[in-house]
Amino acid sequence: ALPIYKNINFSSREQKIKHMNPYEIIDKYYPENTQQRQILVIHSLAVSGKAMKMLDAHPELRLNRSFVKEAALLHDIGIFQTDAPTIQCFGTHPYIAHGYLGAEILRAEGFPQHALVCERHTGAGLSLEDIIAQQLPVPHREMLPITLEEQLICFADKFFSKTHLDEEKTVEKARQSIAKYGEEGLSRFDRWCSLFL
């Protein structure tokens, strides 16, 4: 095996994953014909498209195609609960909480593996150590992407912002956007460049 695969958990391929229509869940939490829904869907489709292109370019990774598509479309399902008016979200939680809030929604809907993608996609993932050191307003637990599918979606998400929906970031701009999360995040991002690009 190549060294880059060392210590990677392939559990999402090994477990029985319950599949679904992501739009049934989106419909439940995001009313039709709202800017909030439009922002969510356009961004999520861009992330899903990028993830699927990388998945197709790397058949040797044997990623779970339907899971990647579904989870990429739902990775930001929790944004409506946050206070982020620039993207039409008028909830009460800080934006950084959208990952674990989305995970709570998907667990309640019966999709625990999809929930982990929500919880683990913020930045390049959040370690418990970083959460505590930076006093981030999220639960104190590891929130690092583990499976290759989780890593792929987290990586694809770094190329798109919800404030510039029609623009894909360059690798350098995507890298800069996660620099605020620390050296560990940059190191993960660089590993993903080698693995997925």
Placement of each model-derived feature along the sequence:
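Active-site flanking loop/helix segments enriched in acidic
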Residues: 21-43, 81-91
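Divalent metal-dependent catalytic cores for phosphoryl transfer on phosphate-bearing substrates
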Residues: 31, 60-167, 171
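Active-site hotspot residues in diverse enzymes, especially metal/ion-binding acidic/histidine motifs
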Residues: 19-26, 53, 57, 171
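Amphipathic alpha-helical segments within well-ordered protein domains
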Residues: 27, 48, 52-55, 102-107, ...
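Cationic, low-complexity basic patches in intrinsically disordered or flexible, solvent-exposed regions
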Residues: 15
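Short, small-residue-biased leader/transition segments that mark boundaries at the very start
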Residues: 1-2
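Charged phosphate-binding loop/patch that engages nucleotide di/tri-phosphates or the phosphate backbone
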Residues: 180-197
